[in-house]
Amino acid sequence: MKRKIIMDCDPGHDDAIALILAGAIDSPLEILAVTTVAGNQSVDKNTTNALNVLDIMGRQDIAVAKGADRPLIKPAAFASEIHGESGLDGPKLPSTPSRQAVAMPASDVIINKVMTSDTPVTIVATGPLTNVATALIREPRIAEHIESITLMGGGTFGNWTPTAEFNIWVDAEAAKRVFESGITINVFGLDVTHQVLADEHVIERFESINNPVAQFVVELLQFFKKTYKTHFNMDGGPIHDACTILYLLQPELFAMVPVNIDIEHQSPLTYGTMAVDLNHVTGKPANAYFATAVDVEEVWNLIDHKLRTYE
């Protein structure tokens, strides 16, 4: 039986790659829905991007629901300098997808899919956690029916402020609510995602895969590589969000440690900081599993295999 997942995302180059890996022909994952949230770009642009990516994948069977257009409390903030004005700059995509998002809001879709599933559902969250927190606030009972939340966000250092990673910083109040939910949470932060850089050698490898999906990924990675060289002086783009799906596909690729995680949501200086108690100094019980290392070579092998299934 396939593992049932809901992908809550803000596509986003790395979100797009995560979608492609999850929806591959031989995937052991069943995508119940894709829900979008404001983050890398506006929720309208992110929704268009999700629909376009699913079109490229040939997965028009997967419903897309538009979610929160701003965080729980503070104004919206976008990452245009990283993902471009469209949120998926680089590839040429249609301005109007082949279909529209469903009418039901994302948080309602999350609640509905979780509560009506005959097996527990995994939430894969690769953007700000606004939709997930909203669903938990509106229907707390979903926590009992969620197998895990596997998310990209946070880390022991920052990329948007000196101490905060973008996804958590956008809506720290939502993140705090999620980490206090009691649900099993698998965290893929900058500590591990910065180990998986798609450099020129990786891009050349994927260029040899002769199908439209693989070539779309190449265009995504080329844009991301340039962006990360310009803004962070890195030799490749980290495939941040894809790590969530890679873990669900092949968990042995990652070293995970149980830790207590808390989210700072009050300090103007450190808002959005993820406090990861790696050394167990607080004495608080673990509420998450935190990725610390990854088998990079096997990551590229797995992605190569998944891209070839689209031939």
Predicted regions and their residues:
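Generic secondary-structure boundary/loop-capping signal
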Residues: D69, A79, E85, L129, ...
